[in-house]
Amino acid sequence: IEGVDTRALVRHLRDNGSKMGIISTEIFDVDELAERLAAAPTLVGENLVKTVSCPAPHEFVAADLPATHDFALAVAAPARHKVVAYDCGVKRGILEGLVRAGCDLTVVPWDTPARQVLDMNPDGVFLSNGPGDPDAVVETYEQVQQLIGKVPIFGICLGHQMISLACGAQMEKLKFGHRGGNQP
């Protein structure tokens, strides 16, 4: 892609919010592309988590962790905490970071029943990041509702939203995503 004034695009998105878009290397008719875009489904109400979660519970073993790296603990701490991680689309680096912090991890699918998690007798439950509309991931936050008060729970990104929904919060999509300090 070339010839796009990215600064003008960023200003437009800032003022008008995030937009659906379409790019094609085969269709060049603007009206046809506009029709295809109008017919495309939105992400609102779509549970994308079920398409990216692991299919079955498994132990996460980070045997191939580098001995050191600049952005995390220098060496993995001995496993002190048994943590069950709900996989809502978790990134491997996050699991590796938890291992480095001393967690013994069991990763479970996004819709694993709370009773099954509690039967694992974890010291804590981690809710991972993931894609899509948090309101569409009902099965996860319903399980979190059953875990609250029984085991410590922590999360990141979508995981925070799952905890909030389980506690009765309502989600509202921001006009545009927040991606750091260099906002236009």
Language-model segment annotations:
Residues 119, 124, 128-184:
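Cysteine-nucleophile active-site neighborhood
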Residues 1-120, 134:
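RNA-binding accessory domains that recognize and position tRNA/RNA substrates
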